[in-house]
Amino acid sequence: MRKKILTLTLALIMLIMPFMSTKSINQVNASEQIVDSTCKAYVLMDKDSGKVLNENNSDTRMPVASIVKLMTILLTLEKIDCGEISVTDKVTVSENASGMGGSQVFLDANCEYEVGNLLKSVIVCSANDSSVALAEYIAGNEQLFVKEMNEKAKELNMTNTNYENATGLPSTNQYSSALDVAKVLREVLDYDLYQEYSKVWLEDFVHPSGRTTEMTNTNKLSRFYEGCLGGKTGSTNEAKYCLGVGAKRNNLSLIAVALGCENSKERFSTCSEMLNYGFSHYENKVVFNQENLNDIKIKMQGQNEMLSLVCERESNIVTEIGKEIKVDLKFNLPNSLVSVKQNECVGSVDVIINGEKYDSINLLSSKDIKEPSYLDYLKRIQEDFIG
C-alpha cells in the first residue's frame, strides 16, 4: 500500500531571551560550572528524557554509601508492581537482618513485619535491617538479591556500578557513579508508592510488640525544597556525604546527584543549586500532541467516513528557555484503509527538530470501523450516482 507523507512545519520561537546563541538541539553545555561545591562528582539530569544537562566527573567510580539502597528499593517496587509480592505480605526477620547495625529501625528477630512498612523505613530513614529483610524475602538470601541488583544495573546501562550488598555498608568492590545513581533514581521516581513514602517526614515505626522506633526522613529537601519528588542520602567515612534527589516544577522534572561532599550541609546545598539552575534555565516544551492531529484523517474505502487518529503519547523536549527551535512533523500514513480496530496502530509521525530526527510516535485508530459489505458498496454506488 502506498504511503503518503505529510510534512507540517511549525516554528516554535521563544522570545524570552533573544540574545541566546542557537545550538544543535542535542548540544547542551554540560561541562559549564553551575555550582560552587567541593563535591567529587555531580550530575544534573532531565528525568523524562535522561538527558544530562550538566555534570562533573559523573562517570567516575566511587563509593556511594546508602545510595546503594536505591536499587534495593527499585527491585522491591518492581516486585510489588508486578504482583509477585504485596505491601501486606508478612516478612519474618532473620537474626542476620536484625543485626545489621548502622542506620536501622531495630527490627525484632523472628518477628513478622509487613513489606510496606519495611520498604517505608528504607525510603524514609535508610534502615539497613529492613533492607536486608526485604532482600532475603525477595531472593532467599542477600547475595542472591545482590545478583539481581547487578543484573538490573546492567539492564539500565549503569556501566560504572557494582553492588556487593543491599545496604551500602562499606565493601571492598562496591561502587557507583553520579550518572548511574541518576539512572536508577530516574526509575524509582516513576513509582507512586515511592513518592508517597518519600513525603513522610516524621513517623513512628510500630513493631509487633507494640514498641515504636521514630523515623525521621534523612532527605531534608523532601520537606524544604518546593516540588521535591524524593531522594536518597548516603554517608560513610569512605564515601563522605552523598545525595540523589528529584524535583518537579512547571512540568519540568529534574534529577540532581552530588557525591563525595565534605559535609551533610554541602550535599543538600549542591543539589539545591543544581535544581535551581535547571528550573531557571530550562523548560519542558511540548512538540507534538493530540492537537496536531485535528486535521489529519484517513479515508475509509467504500464508506462515507474519515478515520480520526489518536497519538499514543505526546512528545516533549527540554531545551534552554528562550531558545529558537524548528519542529517538522513527518506523517507516515496509508492513503486509505478498508477496516480497522480501535487503538490499532495505523501509522506514525516523526518529530524532526532543527533538521534532526528527535522522536517517533505511533498513531492509533480512534474507533472500530468494519469492512463494508457488498450491500454497502451497492449503496455507495447508488449514492454517488444520484449525487
Put a short name on every predicted segment.
Residues 3-5, 26-27, 31, 294, ...:
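Polar/charged alpha-helical tracts
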Residues 21-179, 183-192:
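Active-site-adjacent loops and short helices of periplasmic peptidoglycan-processing enzymes
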Residues 2-27:
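Sec-dependent N-terminal signal peptides of Gram-positive bacterial secreted proteins and lipoproteins
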Residues 6-9, 37-38, 60-61, 118, ...:
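Generic detector of short alpha-helix boundary/capping microenvironments
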Residues 3-5, 70, 249:
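Hydrophobic alpha-helical segments, especially transmembrane helices
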Residues 16-17, 82, 286-289:
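Residues in and immediately flanking transmembrane alpha helices
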